[in-house]
Each structure stands twice: as C-alpha cells, then as structure tokens.
Amino acid sequence: MRRIWTHYAFGVAALALLLASGSASAWECDFLTGGGFIIRDSGAKANFGVGGGCKHGSPTWGHLEYQDHGTGLNVHWTSITGYFEVDSNTDSRGKPIGARRICGTARTNLYGDVDWFVIARDTGEPGVDDEFTIRLTPLGGGIPLYTTEGDSDHTLGGSGPGGGNIQLHNPNPSTMGPFGGDCPAFPTFTGG
C-alpha cells in the first residue's frame, strides 16, 4: 500500500510542478498587426487598424482604431490590457498563422469609455481569408454595447466582402514575455 501512495504522491507533485510552470502553450509570444475593412450584415462598411503583442519590460503593447460608417461609431484605444493566443500554426513556408485576442480600453463617440476585445486571424498569404471581429462592453465588462460577432462574414476579402490584411509576426527580442493580461470584455478569458 505504501508503494501505491508513493507513486500517487510523485504523480501529484509532477502535476503541480507542470501547472505552476505557466502556459501549456509552447508558442513564443509574438505580435500581430493589421488593417482593412469589413462589411457588416447591415451593408455598412467598417474600417479598422489594429496591433498588439507582448513587450519586453512591460506586459503588452498595441493599438486599435475602428470606425463603423453605418452607425457613426468611432473607437480609439486608450490602453492595451491583454494579448492572448487563440490558436497557432505555421503555413507551408514556415510563417506563423493563427488568431490572437487583443484586449483593452477605449474611448468612443457613442458609448463613452469602454472595454473591448478584437479577435484577429491571419490565415496566411495573401491575406484574403483573414478575419476581424470586435466587441465593446461597459467598463468592467457586461452585456455588449456593440459587436460584430453575430455578422455572417468577418473575412477581409477572398470570397468575402471585406478587404485588408492581418499579419502575425515571428517573435523577436522586443516581444519577449508571456501571453496574458486581463480582458473584461471577454470575462471567461481573464487572468494570465
């Protein structure tokens, strides 16, 4: 019986060490940039410019500008609070592809100050099937004030109506650090 408990204790200790060591992702933190436009289900055009990543010496960096020409909404970032890996892979040439969630706060002309997140996906080159989605919530989270999540097409070209490019960049010495941060606009994805 003592032998079983010894093996059990060793297994629990190994699991605790694994969990305490941080993210299970082997992907190094990187950065993402992008710009373009999407066509909302209403037919309105919305332009965006986005960037984000890990930053050596501080947790995250980035920016967001977004304008919906149908509603007149204008969003200007004021801080970046999180940068998260959604999924990662490489294309046939070894270049990184995948999606990232960038989170922050912004001021808007319609809702005042808000929390937000963007999911931006790089599907490879050319960027015709890249994707962009945005959600705005009251500060501290809550029911979305604005979102493109329910729209039928988030692509930036190809067979879709939008245009632009999302580019996931390889890690470099200035983007060292862990994925993570806080994302009140996406409450099940906080901490890090």
Model-derived features with residue positions:
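Residue-level detector of buried hydrophobic side-chain packing
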Residues: 34, 102-104, 134-136
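Predominantly extracellular/secreted and cell-surface proteins with exposed
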Residues: 48-120
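Edge beta-strand at a domain terminus
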Residues: 139-192
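Boundary/junction segments of secreted and surface-exposed precursor proteins
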Residues: 23-41, 175-192
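A short, surface-exposed beta-strand/turn
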Residues: 113-131, 135
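Bacterial N-terminal signal peptides
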Residues: 9-20
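Bacterial N-terminal signal peptides that target proteins for export
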Residues: 1-11
